[in-house]
């Protein structure tokens, strides 16, 4: 996690949906430089002006010390502590799919996506 991640939203937003990592975070002393925890995902969600969010990077492989089902539980706790409703995050089961509709411009045509030359 880095506060600079909010710059993505400022340059390319607003977003309808954000894929935010919530897993592979324990132990924090070791994983904090590479992986966001659920609390940090909630913080980034707020910095991105609260789009719909799909939690990613959890529940498939045991990559860290937390159990496979802990990240969504910690996410719900983090949302509750932040005073946010849980329905804005859509944790999907393995193989589950959803259809989303939105209004953000297509990335290749978005002016902020153009490379600086």
Q: What positions do the PLM features span?
A:
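Core dinuclear metal-dependent hydrolase active-site scaffold
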Residues: 1-13, 77, 93-117
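Cap/insert and terminal regions of metallo-dependent hydrolase folds
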Residues: 2-92
């Amino acid at each position: 996690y880095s506060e600079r991640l909010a710059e993505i939203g400022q340059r390319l937003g607003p977003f309808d949906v954000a894929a935010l990592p919530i897993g592979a975070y324990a132990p924090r002393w070791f994983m904090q430089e590479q992986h966001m925890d659920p609390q940090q995902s909630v913080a980034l969600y707020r910095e991105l002006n609260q789009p719909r969010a799909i939690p990613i990077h959890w529940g498939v492989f045991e990559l860290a010390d937390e159990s496979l089902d802990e990240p969504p539980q910690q996410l719900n706790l983090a949302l509750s502590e932040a005073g946010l409703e849980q329905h804005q995050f859509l944790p999907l089961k393995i193989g589950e799919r959803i259809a989303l509709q939105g209004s953000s411009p297509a990335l290749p045509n978005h002016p902020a996506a153009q490379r600086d030359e």
